[in-house]
Amino acid sequence: MRYMTAGESHGKGLSVIIEGIPSGLIIDFDQVQREMTRRQGGYGRGRRMQIEQDAVDVRGGIRHGYTTGAPISLFIENKDHTHWTKVMQAEPLQEELERPRTLTRPRPGHADLVGGLKYGHRDLRDVLERSSARETAARVAVGAIAKQLLGQLGIDVFSHVRSIGGIDADFVNPMEYREVIEASPVRCADEAAAERMMAAIDQAKKDGDTLGGEVEVVVTDMMPGIGSFTQNETKLDSRIARAVISVNAMKAVGFGDGFDLARRKGSTVQDEILHDETGYFRKTNHLGGIEGGMSTGMPIRVQVAMKPIPTLYRPLQSVDIETKEPFVAQVERSDACAVPAAAVVLEAVVAVEIAAAVLEMFGTSTLDRLKQAVTAYREEVRLF
């Protein structure tokens, strides 16, 4: 399974092509829409979320509600494009724009300057438009389909927020607090911490500042042995790490107890192996459900650190690339905090990697055969 996205933040829309989804998967379009809506929510989002009402237009690969096995083509319209038609048109301009929206003052922390250097763009909007987190809407659409495929195999993927702006939630088992997490404006299981997080976001907004945080993605009911120890690109944790770090503003990733593992003795962090009538399992899950690049059957736990969004309403020092004079960076519309929304995006990219690894292992072209193969494998490892 693989996918590719195209499109700009203020262009006509986002396109995505997904290859490798088996035939016979009945798509719940309402669930796809719920995933798109979840991405647009979360405390701290900016004004654009009031403009865009993301809807997925299927243009191929799904017929009469089920996948055909052909590449799936999706399109998500940018409602805001109506205000940017001339600025973003593909055809050469016939006259000078009244408001060209040229970007020559790169924003620290964004792709603006380095992208301009790499591709030779004197108008850094050509970098901004594609590097924008708007692209993650397409990834959530892909993830929505991947999650439905995994659901057919009994595998679930969800997320919760562990911290925002230095405010940490008390540790709880997120699997026991799903309803609380989904109802929380900041996707936090600790309701007292959630209130403090929202107050911090409000203050950051008043200050023209932004906040980052930490998200955990959890994958439950995984069968063991997905991934491989044989090559670096087939290791499951390697694939997941690459995918989550590719999401805008993500700067660190850990598994299980993450960076805390580096501070402890080996005797306290290895997960002891036990066995009963259900098969092998671990006494603890410090390593986050992956050993040697393969799933162990325990819940996969992925922690991801998101930096504060670099677009500030009180912008930082920059340089105009035309005059070389010092200026404050250009201001673009942005969020004060996108950590809760990022959690939904991270769910999607993790789901895609899990689905891709499962499909690579079982290599079937229809959903029925895939389900049969997974069921047989689960029984095989139970009896091992």
From Swiss-Prot:
Note describing how the cofactor binds: Reduced FMN (FMNH(2)).
Tell me which cofactor or cofactors this protein depends on.
FMNH2
Gene Ontology terms describing biological process: amino acid biosynthetic process; aromatic amino acid family biosynthetic process; chorismate biosynthetic process
Q: What class of enzyme is it?
A: lyase
Q: Which family does it belong to?
A: Belongs to the chorismate synthase family.
Under Enzyme Commission nomenclature, its number is 4.2.3.5
Q: Report the protein's function.
A: This reaction introduces a second double bond into the aromatic ring system.
Q: Provide the species name.
A: Exiguobacterium sibiricum (strain DSM 17290 / CCUG 55495 / CIP 109462 / JCM 13490 / 255-15)
* GO MF, one annotated term: FMN binding
Which Pfam families does the entry link to?
Chorismate_synt (PF01264)
Q: How does this protein assemble?
A: Homotetramer.
The Gene Ontology CC terms held by the record are: cytosol
Q: What is this protein called in UniProt?
A: Chorismate synthase
